[in-house]
Swiss-Prot record:
A GO biological process held by the record: negative regulation of miRNA catabolic process
GO cellular component, one term: cytoplasm
Keywords: ATP-binding, Cytoplasm, Developmental protein, Differentiation, Magnesium, Manganese, Metal-binding, mRNA processing, Nucleotide-binding, Oogenesis, Transferase
Family per record: Belongs to the DNA polymerase type-B-like family. GLD2 subfamily.
Species in which this protein is naturally found: Xenopus laevis
Main location (coarse class): cytoplasm
Known role: Cytoplasmic poly(A) RNA polymerase that adds successive AMP monomers to the 3'-end of specific RNAs, forming a poly(A) tail. In contrast to the canonical nuclear poly(A) RNA polymerase, it only adds poly(A) to selected cytoplasmic mRNAs during oocyte maturation. Plays a central role during oocyte maturation by mediating polyadenylation of dormant mRNAs, which contain 5'AAUAAA-3' sequence in their 3'-UTR. In immature oocytes, polyadenylation of poly(A) tails is counteracted by the ribonuclease parn.
Positions of the PAP-associated domain: 409-462
Protein name, per record: Poly(A) RNA polymerase GLD2-B
Name of the gene: tent2-b
Upper taxonomic lineage: Eukaryota, Metazoa, Chordata, Craniata, Vertebrata
Disulphide bonds in the chain: none
Length: 509
């Protein structure tokens, strides 16, 4: 399926030469059980020069010129090949700004050269032709096109191989509640059309594994995690996939280190990987690189070291399967919010993560709670200092929460809308999943002068900080009130959503 497979006619990779074995021996001395804050680039460069002192080191070029990267103050990550972009032994400028001479031979790795048509049409230089729709290819200097051999990256302690994480497909009880009324049945029918399928998750994880393989040639101690709705049980078939690249388990400055790393990866994706389409570097509070995987068709958002996203993914995943009603209720509410224009943090409304926290909070605060506070009930499973490679294992043995509350899905949806339309005090209260209740606002900066306050369960930040305009806050409250009145009077999901149209679209995916 991937480059160097028999179907592509590539010859097997040669055995490493003596010089490469020396490099591997050097790298093997680096312990892999600790965070990758081991070598600065300067230290690594010096060690590499000692190993390769009689060899011609490859040059790092960007747009035909040697790239000089301004050093950060004691950066905690290290490069394997001195930089993200490694050229073959011959100068890469031989591929640029000239026509091919008639006396140049055709090697097995010759590829057609393409120019970028426009910044909006970001295809890849040196694209091989033709590319089948079900393969992923890389270009000269990338690990799948090894004109310059490099040692294989180490496997981090506690992790599975690059082929994927087998625990993703562990059996989970996904039986659904019995619907005894029309509205509950409509919710279940829509949920079954919306929910992410196992095949959708596998496609995303295959791309994650292939990207991790590429990135580990640049940052050998790194690990790429699939996070967010794709993994927490609340994803729909059309959900974007969130990726978190972890270089160290300590906090990273998102304005300097993370931006610098993402800019390097953006350049690498842009020029080396044929299966990455439209990579965009977004300089937000948590910077990301957005791109599309041509093979799966999935959209991805890649961040660096935003490790709280890994922890809350598995917290929410545990909540998702505690009670059979949780996932259907959350997915239908997310779809309602999206359809009515209040589910877009980039436009000053609610993020999907915030909406999920609001639904879970409501289920915790019922007179007979459907959900507990997992962080209070099982603190050892959700310790925010736990090593990342243990985070997915800790909640595995938590049993289902046996609630005495048997309220049907239709009534829960109506109650959720009523709670935030007329009962919750937006001006005085903080939504807290960690405490399983509404907390009184304090005068802390995080909550001061905010229209909506939703506590992030691990770092205590406000996940609803994007709602900073009164106009958007009024819109959100108005949609809750309008939906509650419509559903109260009609008891029909069609009064909130064009259900048939949504289901038809989902079935076509």
């Amino acid at each position: 399926m991937y480059p160097n497979s028999p179907s592509l006619g590539r010859i097997p990779l040669p055995l490493p030469c003596a010089r490469q074995q020396q490099t591997s021996a050097y790298l093997s001395k680096v312990p892999v059980s600790v965070a990758p804050d081991l070598l600065s680039p300067e230290q690594f460069f010096q060690a590499s020069l000692n190993i390769h002192k009689n060899a011609n080191l490859p040059r790092l070029l960007m747009n035909g010129n040697v790239l000089t990267v301004p050093p950060l103050s004691s950066p905690p990550w290290s490069y394997l090949n001195h930089s993200p972009l490694i050229s073959p032994g011959s100068p890469p400028s031989s591929f640029q700004n000239r026509k091919r001479r008639s006396d140049e031979g055709n090697s097995p790795y010759d590829v057609k050269r393409q120019r970028f048509q426009s910044p909006q049409e970001q295809t890849v230089n040196h694209q091989a032709v033709p590319l089948r729709g079900d393969i992923r290819c890389s270009y000269p200097g990338s690990p799948a096109f090894p004109l310059l051999q490099s040692p294989s990256p180490p496997v981090l302690k506690g992790h599975s191989s690059n082929s994927g994480d087998c625990w993703l497909y562990d059996h989970i009880d996904t039986t659904l509640p019995v619907a005894k009324d029309k509205l509950s049945k409509q919710i279940l029918d829509l949920f079954q059309a919306l929910q992410q399928q196992v095949c959708d998750l596998k496609k995303k994880d295959i791309c994650r594994a292939e990207l991790q393989r590429e990135i580990q040639q640049i940052f050998p101690q790194s690990r790429l995690y699939l996070v967010g709705s794709s993994l927490n049980g609340f994803g729909i078939r059309s959900s974007d996939a969130d990726l978190c690249l972890v270089l160290k388990e300590e906090p990273m400055n998102q304005n300097t280190e993370a931006r610098h790393i993402l800019s390097l990866l953006h350049k690498h994706f842009y020029t080396r990987l044929s299966y990455i389409e439209r990579p965009q570097f977004i300089r937000a509070k948590v910077p990301i690189v957005k791109f599309r995987d041509k093979v799966s068709g999935a959209e991805f958002d890649l961040n660096v070291n935003n490790v709280v996203g890994i922890r809350n993914t598995f917290l929410l995943r545990t909540y998702a399967y505690l009670d059979k009603r949780v996932r259907p209720l959350v997915l239908v509410i997310k779809k309602w919010a999206n359809h009515h224009g209040i589910n877009d943090a980039s436009r000053g409304t609610l993020s999907s993560y915030t909406i999920v926290l609001m639904v879970l909070h409501y289920l915790q605060t019922l007179p007979e709670p459907i959900l507990p506070s997992l962080q209070k009930k099982y603190p050892e499973c959700f310790d925010r200092t736990m090593q990342l490679h243990l985070v997915h294992q800790a909640p595995r043995n938590i049993p289902q929460f046996l609630s005495k509350n048997e309220t049907p899905l239709g009534d829960l949806l109506l109650g959720f809308l009523k709670y935030f339309a007329v009962e919750f005090d937006w001006s005085k209260d903080i939504i807290s999943l960690r405490e399983a209740k509404a907390l009184p606002r304090t005068d802390d900066y995080e909550w001061r002068n905010k229209y909506i306050c939703v506590e992030e369960p691990f770092d205590g930040s406000n996940t609803a900080r994007a709602v900073y305009e009164k106009q958007k806050f009024d819109l959100i409250r108005a949609e809750f009130l309008k939906a509650w009145v419509a559903l109260r009077d009609n008891r029909d999901l069609y009064s909130l959503l064009p259900v048939k149209g949504i289901m038809k679209k989902m079935h076509s995916l």
